[in-house]
Amino acid sequence: MTSVIFMGTPEFSVPVLEGLIEAGYEIRAVVTQPDKKVGRKQKIAKTPAKIAAEKHDLPVLQPVKLSGSEEMNQLIDMHADLIVTAAYGQFLPTKFLKSVNIAAVNVHGSLLPKYRGGAPIQYSLINGDKETGITIMEMVKKMDAGDIYAQEAIKIEPEDNAGTLFSKLSILGRDLLLKTLPSIIDGSVKKTPQDPDKVVFSPNITKEQERLSIDMTAEQANNMIRALNPDPGAYLMINGQRFKVWEAEVASDSSSLEAGTVVANKGRFAISFADNTVLNLLEVQPSGKKRMNIKNFLNGQGSKFVTGEEIVDK
């Protein structure tokens, strides 16, 4: 039986882990990020990978920093056949990568070399890409720079957001990994080096990116809204208050009104953006309120806004 050290943290990693278990791989350990305090009550939350591991009675390691840790020494001493990572979220030292008998393999949520880094799925949406996919790759010291074992593309639908793409890609990642592992194990796999001239990076989303700017076109704003749904969410600043926008669509009409102005508030709630473009807001969350569809917003708080009023803070 082929032994695996599995490393993953978010929901994206769970189908990959469960796929390995169901396919009969021996999971020696699951390595995931430490538990975190979340919400106003600061409750301790386990990572999705840890929850899945405990369900299957697998040993779990959660080093704050893997490099130089006692946990890393434990993992090296396991002499596993494979390391498999899926959105683990930490740097893996070369010493550890080289400690396995066969290979260290990563399931990455983009078509490398496009979107190396921590937010490949979000950047495919931010940039309005029409497709994305999964890369099964060899892990090396440099981030996401290893040779490619296999790739598969999927179409990005207009209604997709980060949440739906994460779900689709985690299933695709599981399936492509399980299809590719036998040829990695028996040595017959053909590796393709990444083209260094085509490398694009996707660094983690910053707090600044969460705020929608009226210098954006409606399409750019909508792409950002999709990229930040369900977490952390994009927002406009309206009269000094955060106004989250969970879902929107680019309107078919244009407007000569100043960007940040209410274009319509009867039957729809539309705001002007750069280049005379208009965005229809479909699901919103005013500061201190729950998420609501636009009909409920217009029946309540939204009824105070009038067409032609500049409401978005610059």
UniProtKB/Swiss-Prot annotation:
Answer yes or no on keyword NAD: no
Any Pfam family the entry gives:
Formyl_trans_N
Entries under CDD domains matching the protein: FMT_core_Met-tRNA-FMT_N (cd08646), Met_tRNA_FMT_C (cd08704)
Q: What class of enzyme is it?
A: transferase
What keyword terms does UniProt attach to this protein?
Answer: Protein biosynthesis, Transferase
What the entry lists under Gene3D superfamilies is as follows:
3.40.50.12230
User: GO CC: one term?
Assistant: cytosol
The chemistry this enzyme catalyses reads: L-methionyl-tRNA(fMet) + (6R)-10-formyltetrahydrofolate = N-formyl-L-methionyl-tRNA(fMet) + (6S)-5,6,7,8-tetrahydrofolate + H(+)
Positions annotated to bind (6S)-5,6,7,8-tetrahydrofolate? S110, L111, L112, P113
- What EC designation does it have? 2.1.2.9
This protein's record includes keyword Isomerase = no
Any one Gene Ontology molecular-function term assigned to this protein's record:
methionyl-tRNA formyltransferase activity
What is the stated purpose of this protein? Attaches a formyl group to the free amino group of methionyl-tRNA(fMet). The formyl group appears to play a dual role in the initiator identity of N-formylmethionyl-tRNA by promoting its recognition by IF2 and preventing the misappropriation of this tRNA by the elongation apparatus.
The Swiss-Prot or TrEMBL record describes its family as follows:
Belongs to the Fmt family.
By what name is this protein known? Answer: Methionyl-tRNA formyltransferase
Organism in which the protein naturally occurs: Lactobacillus acidophilus (strain ATCC 700396 / NCK56 / N2 / NCFM)
The lineage, from the top, is: Bacteria, Bacillati, Bacillota, Bacilli, Lactobacillales
Instruction: Identify the coding gene.
Output: fmt
